[in-house]
């Protein structure tokens, strides 16, 4: 009996260590970045971290995605992996519902209602997820077997294009400044100038460019205005003076005498406004280097003739993929160093309120993972998950358990809405996530690996 009980204790200790050790490795990298960028030491200036984030965005991450996803993907895998992008959509929908409950319970300031929903709904399904998977797979006791890292990175990369589309369409418009708040500020021109100076200040938080370098170059005429609210607010108005910023005839339809202008005038009022909003949606930003790398990997990997030329030990272009693989290996340490630099700035002052901050963090880091367990396990029992790989289910579960996406801070800055609140909330979420992720990774190991073993038996 004593031997049996000691064996159980040892097994539990191994399970706990298997979940703690990967995060400890990531914490070490983050602490190094924090010490290097801390204002008291300033061993590495903030500008260096901005350059490092640009390298991650434009080079390291695309190289990692292309080499790992391209080598793993096949036409059969695309069919088997269909639940990965669907799971991203499910996590966003369920997160939005939970975020709405947070609004009802915590009652944030009215101008932050949409912000609360967005920060609860959209998690970091990109860089942080890749870092967690890589750290787990570089542990000797990892339960996922050989080729763990390649499979995990492929699953995460296959989901990124869905998350990017959601951010640059749905999230972009949900994060526009509230109409009522904007009109109050608009009455006092001095206040507008102060807000614009703050948004364009060179001392903006590092998180603004942590996952979207060069964001200041992406600003458009209407990006910091309540564009959609004003467009559709003018539907019930017979006068165009209530919406002076958007030239529905001249700007989008050309000269008044042109055929296109005549066609636009014949459009229904609602359809014309939908078209204007669609033209103001930054769809072109979807084709960023990581997304392009994902598309190229899927295309090349799905065509056997192309894949045999690019991937494999005997491939004629294997020297190129080997070089890209070397550069891609720098992604995880670079991302964690940038995260440490972001955390070194500390939390900004926030008017969101302590109750709402705690509510969003609890909902995102504790409640949503529990709901995710129910969704993924139910999908597995219903036969919707065709892959028997435990890493597949592990990635699906992780998509529900990460902090809010750092990219949301960049969108907040681009829209001029809740920039300080996003910075403060992301700071505290990443601090609390150290505990929540440790707890849930241990649970996910048991659910994925033990369930798979029992199913084989």
Curated annotation (Swiss-Prot):
GO BP annotation list: auxin-activated signaling pathway; endoplasmic reticulum to cytosol auxin transport; intracellular auxin homeostasis; lateral root formation; regulation of growth rate; response to auxin
Localization terms from the record: Endoplasmic reticulum membrane
Membrane topology: Multi-pass membrane protein
Main location group: endoplasmic reticulum
This protein's GO CC annotations: endoplasmic reticulum membrane
Keywords attached to this entry: Auxin signaling pathway, Endoplasmic reticulum, Membrane, Transmembrane, Transmembrane helix, Transport
Upregulation: Up-regulated by auxin application.
MF terms in GO: auxin efflux transmembrane transporter activity
Cytoplasmic side: 37-54, 107-116, 173-291, 344-356, 415-424
Disruption phenotype: Increased root growth and lateral root initiation.
Domain of life: Eukaryota
Statement: the UniProt record of this protein carries the keyword Membrane: yes
Tissue specificity of this protein: Expressed in seedlings, rosette and cauline leaves, flowers and siliques.
Lumenal membrane side: 1-15, 76-85, 138-151, 313-322, 378-393, 446-457
InterPro entries for this protein: Mem_transp_PIN-like (IPR004776), PILS2/6 (IPR039305)
Residue ranges of the TM segments: 16-36, 55-75, 86-106, 117-137, 152-172, 292-312, 323-343, 357-377, 394-414, 425-445
Keyword Acetylation: no
Function field: Involved in cellular auxin homeostasis by regulating auxin metabolism. Regulates intracellular auxin accumulation at the endoplasmic reticulum and thus auxin availability for nuclear auxin signaling.
Family: Belongs to the auxin efflux carrier (TC 2.A.69.2) family.
Protein name: Protein PIN-LIKES 2
Gene: PILS2
